[in-house]
A protein has these predicted regions:
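Active-site metal-binding motif and surrounding structural segment of the metallo-beta-lactamase
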Residues: 546-551, 556-614, 703-720, 733-738
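Membrane-interface helix/helix-cap signal primarily in integral membrane proteins
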Residues: 58-243, 565-570, 617, 624-647, ...
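Aromatic-rich juxtamembrane segments at the membrane interface
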Residues: 168-298, 305, 379, 531, ...
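N-terminal leader/targeting segments
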Residues: 1-74, 296
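Alpha-helical transmembrane segments of multi-pass integral membrane proteins
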Residues: 350-461, 735-740
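Cap/insert and terminal regions of metallo-dependent hydrolase folds
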Residues: 611, 698-772
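Core dinuclear metal-dependent hydrolase active-site scaffold
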Residues: 328-336, 454-582, 631-709, 770-789
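Hydrophobic alpha-helical transmembrane segments in multi-pass membrane proteins
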Residues: 3-22, 231-397, 413, 468-524, ...
Length: 789
């Protein structure tokens, strides 16, 4: 039965990759093997083959439809005016913005700058961003004009990729600047009732529990995470308990199975109570947005209820496998969704390692049993958490032991309070004492959650930043983990001492393999690299040595207010940089320091700075706020003078950083021309960083007589017309020039004259506008350059 369940669960994953080759590979075997009743085996096999054929055909057709939609989206070149005809299937509010999901039957838009238009007929999902939905309702047919584009893609490693995220949900096109031309009067009555119920429940939640706690309750009950404040979200994420914010099996079990039990006692009928409970759960799923974890839990609950109606007990693996097949049939792309994978990994954790560990540690103690199950779930989901989020909370196992049991209390009490406010609004609206008593248990538990997380964050190694790992490492880890558990179970049950010794030896070998995998994961992708992050209009450079030394040179943006949170932290975590050894600041402009200020101010970012390095004779006045913040955080401040140098690493892998400018002799007042100039040397290659240095600063630098030659030049002042002069380029003689600038910036960077000068000196030019983040790797074999886009 275990093998059958694993095959069922793995089949949809195979289907996604097989669809790309033109063949769907779904497989559902039910109970054709291992069933005690062998007489009907042939019938079950034939039925399984028929189901296999139908699922294969459906999977192939869905895969083809998704491919067509993806190819249609690729026709879009930036923002293009277009039109849509379709039907609204979901309306959701996110902060001050509304997101309207439409099944489009007809899409048209212009092709580039030409007058040619692209027209597509066929059902496809489109996401519309609107400031106000007015009288728009679920189920309405509409015709509209808008600006169409593809969702934004990630420009940096580790950054959130909206294009990939929405593609997993079958959405390849988004629309903005909406103008509704025609709107039908018919709409879904049930959909509208659920929409209004969701909005009203959210308002009640905010009024009863307060804005902060209410946002958490809305996430847990209504699937609305838009109101959760940044600090709460990070607190839960860093401690490995963010999963409680997603609607999953716990919620469905509490709502659905409790309702089923109550109705069964009231009606005395399994069938009637089952139908009513399933109907309520389906409506609840629709109201909360049908997230992948919600759908999985709903399907498994339906199977469980049907099993009880039929007098049979469902198998967890078979139920999970069936749920995965159904979800993959509806939307094959969801298999690659992180939420989908984590949801099923948790179920598998209970079914496979959980079952094996219970055999290893048989106990009637509920605390020990719960701890064992938490460990099993952590082992199952941990590798995926590392793969997607590049970090792991060491104490999450123990926190979940305390936190998860109380989730049911939060859900139950919250539902009772909200239901009471909906049913008896006149009685409870002004009764603050009654409402306060009802809300008290929830507010108390959430306060305990926060306090536990804050205590955990004060412990050493509370969060381990692993960096990105390969898929193969994840696969090997799972194989080794299951292998170790199976061997230990067999060794424990073996009667012969010799067999037990062999099992233990095999187990030791597998553990050694697992340790090697963990070591490889820890040292994965550790080549020396210089990453020019795409921060928009600004500068942000990460230097990561093979010895694990992390250096930042600037980090800020004038075009993105949250460059530290949304760009720098993800990039640092992607490369496993839990701390920055040295953060160099060339000068105090916002587009060079705003991200570093964020790292210094946000203690929950998971990144710390050890040393802040600033020019002794540079733009110190504009760095006042930055220096004050660094002192407050206990960061060591180093003042560097022109002509000084520092090194890190050993022997041939030593990295030299030469501080060339400004010095005590520098006679310039302009803040940009006082930018720190740093020359990096590694294995005979060099990179020159110039901040916002202009032509006057360049002449001053040349007159000081230092070695300016470099293989790679970070072009000064984002490619400004008044920077990177011909004289300076002759002194540097770069093979590669990298420009960091924002797309469609108001300064016109990089300027055409600057590009002409770079071309004349023979340097290859790469810009973050065109390539996104640019990674320069230096090895014994030379320099290699790759763009992230």
């Amino acid at each position: 039965m275990l093998i059958i369940g694993l095959i069922i669960l793995a089949a949809p994953v195979l289907s996604v990759y097989m669809d790309k080759a033109g063949t769907a590979m779904f497989f559902y075997s039910g109970k054709a093997h291992g069933d005690k009743d062998r007489k009907n085996r042939i019938v079950r096999c034939v039925l399984s083959m028929m189901i296999f054929g139908m699922i294969s055909l459906t999977g192939y057709m869905n895969g083809c439809a998704m491919s067509k939609q993806e190819r249609l989206a690729e026709e879009l070149d930036g923002q293009q005016p277009g039109g849509i005809e379709g039907k609204v299937y979901e309306i959701r509010q996110s902060g001050d913005e509304w997101r309207v999901y439409v099944y489009a039957e007809w899409i048209t838009f212009g092709r580039g700058d030409s007058e040619e238009t692209v027209e597509y007929r066929g059902r496809s999902k489109v996401l519309l961003y609107m400031e106000d939905v007015g009288s728009l309702k679920t189920g309405m047919k509409l015709t509209l004009s808008c600006s169409l584009s593809r969702p934004d893609s990630a420009d940096n490693p580790g950054e959130f990729d909206a294009r990939e995220y929405y593609s997993h949900k079958g959405i390849y096109i988004v629309g903005k600047d909406i103008s509704i031309l025609e709107c039908g009067e018919d709409y879904s009555r049930i959909g509208d009732i659920l929409f209004r119920l969701r909005i009203k429940s959210g308002e009640i939640t905010d009024s009863v529990f307060g804005e902060t706690d209410g946002s958490v309750i809305k996430a847990m009950l209504l699937g609305d995470k838009s109101g959760i404040d940044r600090d709460t979200k990070k607190l839960f994420q860093m401690n490995g308990i963010a999963h409680i914010l997603a609607i999953s099996g716990v919620h469905i079990a509490i709502i659905g199975m409790t309702l089923f039990g109550v109705l069964r006692r009231l009606t005395g009928s399994y069938m009637a109570s089952g139908i009513m409970a399933i109907s309520v759960i389906v409506l609840y799923g629709v109201m909360t947005g049908m997230a992948s974890s919600t759908v999985r839990a709903m399907i498994m609950m339906v199977i469980s209820v049907i099993g009880q109606v039929k007098g049979r007990s469902p198998d967890m693996l078979t139920s999970a496998g069936t749920a995965s097949v159904i979800q993959a049939l509806i939307d094959p792309g969801i298999i690659l969704d992180a939420g989908f994978q984590l949801s099923f990994a948790a179920v598998l954790g209970m079914a496979v390692p959980g079952a094996l560990m219970k055999k290893l540690i048989p106990t009637k103690n509920k605390v020990v049993s719960t701890l064992v199950m938490n460990l099993a779930i952590t082992l199952a989901t941990g590798p995926l958490v590392i793969f997607y989020y590049y970090q792991f909370s060491l104490y999450s196992i123990f926190l979940n032991l305390l936190i998860v049991p109380l989730v049911s209390v939060i859900i139950f009490v919250s539902i009772v309070v909200i239901a009471a406010m909906l049913i008896f609004p006149g009685i409870l609206q002004g009764n603050e004492m009654a409402v306060g008593i009802g809300a008290f248990p929830v507010k108390l538990i959430l306060a305990i959650y926060r306090q536990l997380c804050e205590w955990a964050m004060k412990l050493p190694f509370y969060s381990i930043n692993t960096g990105h790992v390969s898929v193969m490492m994840i696969v090997v880890f799972y194989m080794a983990m299951v292998g170790v558990l199976i061997l230990l179970v067999r060794a424990k049950s073996a009667d012969c001492a010799r067999v037990r010794r062999r099992m233990v030896c095999l187990c030791a070998a597998v553990i050694m393999t697992l340790c090697c995998v963990c070591y490889e994961a820890a040292s994965f992708d550790r080549e020396f690299r210089v990453v020019f992050m795409d921060v928009g209009q600004g500068d942000g450079i990460l230097i990561r040595s093979g010895m694990g030394v992390n250096i930042l040179i600037d980090g800020g943006s004038s075009s993105s207010n949250k460059v530290g949170e949304y760009v720098m932290v993800p990039v640092l975590k992607f490369y496993g940089a839990a701390h920055v050894d040295y953060a160099f600041v060339t000068h105090g402009d916002k587009d060079h320091v705003s991200g570093i200020q964020y790292l210094l101010s946000d203690t929950n970012s998971g990144i710390r700075i050890d040393n802040l390095v600033v020019p002794m004779y540079g733009d110190i006045e504009n760095m006042g706020e930055l220096l004050e913040l660094a002192e407050k955080r206990g960061v060591n401040i180093i003042y560097m003078d022109g002509g000084s140098q520092m090194s890190c690493g050993k022997d041939a892998a030593k990295v030299w950083l030469n501080f060339l400018h400004p010095s005590e002799k520098t006679d310039i007042k302009d803040a940009n021309d006082l930018s720190a100039v740093i020359r990096l040397e590694y294995r005979g290659y060099s990179v020159l960083f110039t901040g916002d240095l202009g032509e006057d600063g360049e002449r001053e630098l040349i007159s000081e007589g230092g070695d300016l030659s470099a293989d790679v030049l970070k072009v000064g002042h984002h490619g400004s017309r008044y920077s990177t002069s011909g004289e300076f380029l002759r002194a540097v003689d770069p093979d590669l020039a990298i420009i960091s600038a924002g797309e469609n910036n108001r300064y016109g960077h990089p300027h055409g004259e600057t590009l002409e000068r770079l071309d004349a000196c023979g340097a290859d030019v790469m810009s973050t506008i065109d390539y996104g983040a640019i990674c320069v790797e230096i090895t014994d074999g030379g320099i290699s350059v790759t763009g992230y886009r």
